[in-house]
Design a protein with these regions (language model features):
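Accessory terminal and edge-of-domain segments that mediate assembly/interaction
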Residues: 1-107, 115-270
Length: 270
């Protein structure tokens, strides 16, 4: 069997756990254990992080023990949220997500820029990812083979309703999660388009597979900003590098109370 599917048993416990890594990181760095905010954001592009650092809203979470990333906090819709920038791609995003949930996160929202597959408007616009094609490797460590990894339908529906109540716009639909953005061939694009896939990104399938396996709450958004460089003037995100609209979407979810159950007792990640 090919390695990507060989020796995969999503029901078997892992020998190496985030708690062990975090324990040793704290020991080496002289950090005390501390719960992070219940609501956290993954910002693969780093635009939101850079924006809140420029405006002075970001506060470093000094007890964050991760070897690879920085965790900042800021106020979002009246609540303290954590945010990690530039964790691009499925392996990195899930590594960080594992650590976030091990440190007290209860709801993780991921918002990344994405390429347009089946047109649903003129970019930029947002897609709430209901399901993601599993064209990456990480998800197969968390779930048996399948075509898609899916969002929690109740969480997705509640978030979409919250966005619409505030007069904002997001389209619910499918994405294609790839590991190789510069290998998006015409045949692969057309195949995804034939399935009604709206966007291509690099994290959602793996995050959803992890969420289901671990019993944690994750919701992913694609900010469709480009046609993969096929036209001039591509990759324009909007006001303040797209952060104005992105923060409105995220704030609508937090303000609605959808995130309120983020304060429920934590699940223990697998």
């Amino acid at each position: 069997m090919i390695p990507i599917l060989d020796n995969k048993d999503a029901s078997a416990p892992s020998v190496f756990r985030p708690a062990a890594l975090l324990r040793e990181a704290r020991r080496q760095k002289g950090l005390a254990a501390a719960d992070i905010p219940a609501i956290c954001i993954l910002d693969p592009d780093g635009d939101i992080v850079r924006h809140i650092m420029r405006t002075g809203e970001a506060q470093p979470f000094k007890a964050w023990p991760c070897y690879h990333t920085r965790l900042d906090t800021f106020t979002l819709a009246g609540q303290t949220a954590g945010i990690v920038g530039c964790a691009v791609g499925a392996p990195f995003a899930v590594l960080v997500a594992e650590e976030l949930f091990a440190c007290g996160c209860r709801l993780l929202l991921s918002l990344t820029s994405a390429g347009q597959i089946a047109p649903a408007g003129l970019p930029p616009y947002f897609v709430l990812i209901e399901r993601a094609l599993r064209d990456e490797g990480t998800s197969y460590h968390y779930a048996p083979p399948s075509e898609y990894a899916e969002a929690d339908p109740a969480l997705a529906a509640a978030a979409l309703a919250a966005i619409e109540r505030e007069g904002l716009h997001a389209i619910a639909g499918a994405s294609w999660t790839t590991d190789a953005p510069f290998r998006e061939t015409l045949a692969a694009i057309e195949a995804a388009k034939s399935k009604g896939v709206l966007a291509v990104e690099m994290e959602a399938a793996a995050l959803y597979a992890f969420a289901k396996a671990a019993g944690v709450r994750i919701l992913c958004f694609a900010h469709v900003t480009n046609t993969m460089g096929q036209t001039g003037g591509d990759f324009e995100k909007g006001e303040a590098d797209g952060t104005a609209d992105a923060l409105r979407i995220l704030a609508a979810i937090v303000r609605s109370g959808v995130a309120g159950s983020a304060n429920a007792p934590a699940q223990t990640p697998i």
